[in-house]
Amino acid sequence: MTSHAVHAPGTTTGDALDDNRWTLARPGPFGVLLTATAPGTPVTAVPVPYLRDLARRHHLVALRGFTAPADAAALDAYARTWGEVMEWPFGTVFDVRAHQDPEDHVFDTGFMPLHWDGMYVDHVPEFQIFHCVAAPGPAEGGGTLFCDTTRVLADADPETLERWQGLTLRYRNAKVSHYGGLVVSPLIEPHPDAGFPVMRFLEPVPDGEHIINEPTVSIDGLEGEAAAAELAAIREAAYDPRHRHTHAWQQDDVVIADNYTLLHTREPYRRGLPRHLRRVHVLGDPPLPSHIHDHHGTTGAGTQRGTT
């Protein structure tokens, strides 16, 4: 299977842009890091078509040292220059930070399953746009780990790949905050625009871990040890160092992630440390329908198509 990911180190011809206000580097097995060289350069100085192209080819784009959007309204306005933004019951901008008494693991500081965004609502966003308002120290955890599923599939042996192509998984989560329901999804499906294969996977909670509002994960046609072994194999491949990269947040980082291709999770960190991200979802064109089958047990309104 051919991977869409760019495996060679360094930049490609298409990455070049004649502007000396930033440099471009490859911080991990995938993704690019743009670092401002001129103080006060706003993130809006980097053309969105250029960033969109980088995000679609490298799947993860981080901007560091730029003047970031000043507040949630400014982040919303910036995201709208990318396209149609997703509306949630809370609005368009989600404050990703720990709650004192969390009702869901999203608002906690410990283990979080690897997942893709939009799985429990009507549409899967193409991009996540993050702004880091505050971050723990470099050695204090709290990074966001991303898995490039094109690399997982490119490195799978033919027998494993054939087996995985026939798998359908079921995920259920009670809706105690802004998401929940039943999702029935193939493990592998084509990228909606480019056609290369990507994975849809919500990691089961490992033995020994406990999270608030734990999801259930099952595989159609497999039970017991057979299902557990398959889920463990998928998880092991996702966390292979060749397939993952952790973005260690710094204040005012702006990150664009390709949610069609990547999975992601939060690295645990100690409660009380400063970690505050803002996130906006940008829908594809046309928006990609999710694999949600029902919203059983949901509360409140669901997501809506956004506005530009």
Where are these regions (language model features)?
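Short, acidic/polar
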Residues: T44-R52
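Classical protein tyrosine phosphatase
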Residues: A74
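Active-site environment of non-heme Fe oxygenases that use a 2-His-1-carboxylate facial triad
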Residues: T2-P42, R56, V93-Q251, I256, ...
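Beta-solenoid repeat scaffold
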Residues: T81-F90
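A short aromatic-anchored loop/beta-hairpin motif
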Residues: T67-A70
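Short active-site loop/helix that positions an aromatic residue
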Residues: A77
